[in-house]
């Protein structure tokens, strides 16, 4: 979908704060991306760079000639003194009619006073020393530039252009954001379920949320996460020095569960303490889905302006991650210096498909909320790069080099490293009110290839999604992959060639397999990964795959299958998960992950993940709520379960009518 097709949603009133300022400053009258105007009188940066080199060489030649002149003070006086009024003696250094007014005005020191230049010859020598120093520096910079490869010079120019664009955007952050049309909140507040048993179960899940929140507040308030066993704060390196991940991640869950007092104290913390002006290297992916996603969702649900302001502020901070030759963003970014890099373990310095492919929903909303298409252009460029690449067997490898714009190692997974890329293709189509036809095509082409090359059945009929490594299958499925059952079902209604029932059935089969991975453990919660080889089915065989960290993907699929089929087994399976969490993960200080789901003697990992409040408990609560709470036709969940409204094709018409 061309960015131009999105632009009507992102317009803002003329001169309207960030939107108006950025629309002119960065959009370049429609050029976008901070480009200069393309007229005959405008030089490109590359042309300016060449002219600068020529000019530097000319200046070097002129100053170099001075050093070969005879050492005559009179000659040098003639060359320098007459061309430099600052070095000429004053007409009169005594107060009175003969004194120069500009000397008094600009505070210049006079001879005989402290700080005066004194002897003209000494001043001349100082001046020549500065000239030599500047001359040597210019030569050194020119030499370093000429030694660079052409692509390095182009990269420097690109980064400088992007830096200028970001500086312009940052300078406008002090302006008020333009007014936006708030989508009517359909299903943000619900009624109690009519069935008493369902109502009781939902109340229990709300009590679990209170237990998790109250202990976080008691022992780790303002920290990123809670250590529920040792009762202290925990902070992952994913967030750098940014604080409050649990607070931001939990905002919309608190709102949906009508925990009004807790929501207000969370909002107050965001207003007073959430600070992005820190020297912090962060995961662009994690900060986007948790912080930006959480803030945007809280804004749409509550209408509180502070959440929009903070979301756009952080979005601007993440823009330097895109300053690569291909526009594929870095995985890690120092949000103060703007320096990015990739994970050292990633294939050939590559970016990760699931990370750069999971920015789309949030950045489209950032453009809508800021009134500027700059954010949308960044993620649409990612799609352009991907569409220009050959896909092995129609599959998307997990690694893409941001410098070359080419694939790294051919490793394909619908679990870790790849998962949410496919999720966001489908959800981009749905969130656009089904106008983003490019996203729809990419999604169905991708899952067709996945079904052909990755989906298999075990000897006993369990459907699973294997991993593809250079053409060879590894018969392993991760807990993260279990989200795919819900994805297949959610996209089934728009499937081509009468495949709707097929994809609903595929979703049900994946849900069953993931339920089996839970049922075959002692604690009835699933391992991080499970295998289908050597006679083993849906069981973890390696010690480093037996842990459970309060992950949500299985109950996420239960939610979609319940909403789309109303088969009661999904509520039954969800309640089994609730009982297992209460029995094995609940401790006095909150909820903890487990190191081994196959043993009775529990060893806790002592971390209450922020996504437990953002995702796991939210999905469980929604399973036991009526369908009119966050209905799927009006709300799209980002990969951290933050609900974002569908951007209706009629929004622009409504805005225009209200004006």
Curated annotation (Swiss-Prot):
Topological domains, Cytoplasmic: 1-48
Family to which the UniProt record says this protein belongs: Belongs to the glycosyl hydrolase 47 family.
E.C. code: 3.2.1.113
Any one Gene Ontology cellular component term annotated for this protein: endoplasmic reticulum
Segments traversing the membrane: 49-69
UniProt xrefs under InterPro entries: 6hp_glycosidase-like_sf, Glyco_hydro_47, Glycosyl_Hydrolase_47, Seven-hairpin_glycosidases
PANTHER family, alphabetized: MANNOSYL-OLIGOSACCHARIDE 1,2-ALPHA-MANNOSIDASE IA, MANNOSYL-OLIGOSACCHARIDE ALPHA-1,2-MANNOSIDASE-RELATED
Disulphide bonds in the chain: 482-514
Superkingdom in the source lineage: Eukaryota
Pfam families recorded: Glyco_hydro_47 (PF01532)
Lumenal topological segments: 70-659
Membrane topology of the entry: Single-pass type II membrane protein
Binding site for Ca(2+): 639
Record-given protein name: Mannosyl-oligosaccharide 1,2-alpha-mannosidase IA
Main location: endoplasmic reticulum
Source organism of the structure: Sus scrofa
Any one GO biological process: carbohydrate metabolic process
Basic and acidic residues biased stretches: 91-113
The UniProt record lists the keyword Membrane: yes
Catalytic activity entry: N(4)-(alpha-D-Man-(1->2)-alpha-D-Man-(1->2)-alpha-D-Man-(1->3)-[alpha-D-Man-(1->2)-alpha-D-Man-(1->3)-[alpha-D-Man-(1->2)-alpha-D-Man-(1->6)]-alpha-D-Man-(1->6)]-beta-D-Man-(1->4)-beta-D-GlcNAc-(1->4)-beta-D-GlcNAc)-L-asparaginyl-[protein] (N-glucan mannose isomer 9A1,2,3B1,2,3) + 4 H2O = N(4)-(alpha-D-Man-(1->3)-[alpha-D-Man-(1->3)-[alpha-D-Man-(1->6)]-alpha-D-Man-(1->6)]-beta-D-Man-(1->4)-beta-D-GlcNAc-(1->4)-beta-D-GlcNAc)-L-asparaginyl-[protein] (N-glucan mannose isomer 5A1,2) + 4 beta-D-mannose; N(4)-(alpha-D-Man-(1->2)-alpha-D-Man-(1->2)-alpha-D-Man-(1->3)-[alpha-D-Man-(1->3)-[alpha-D-Man-(1->2)-alpha-D-Man-(1->6)]-alpha-D-Man-(1->6)]-beta-D-Man-(1->4)-beta-D-GlcNAc-(1->4)-beta-D-GlcNAc)-L-asparaginyl-[protein] (N-glucan mannose isomer 8A1,2,3B1,3) + 3 H2O = N(4)-(alpha-D-Man-(1->3)-[alpha-D-Man-(1->3)-[alpha-D-Man-(1->6)]-alpha-D-Man-(1->6)]-beta-D-Man-(1->4)-beta-D-GlcNAc-(1->4)-beta-D-GlcNAc)-L-asparaginyl-[protein] (N-glucan mannose isomer 5A1,2) + 3 beta-D-mannose
Function description: Involved in the maturation of Asn-linked oligosaccharides. Progressively trim alpha-1,2-linked mannose residues from Man(9)GlcNAc(2) to produce Man(5)GlcNAc(2).
Keyword Transcription listed: no
Cofactor: Ca(2+)
Broadest EC class assigned to this enzyme: hydrolase
Pathway(s) it belongs to: Protein modification; protein glycosylation
Gene: MAN1A1
GO function terms (MF aspect): calcium ion binding; mannosyl-oligosaccharide 1,2-alpha-mannosidase activity
UniProt subcellular location: Endoplasmic reticulum membrane
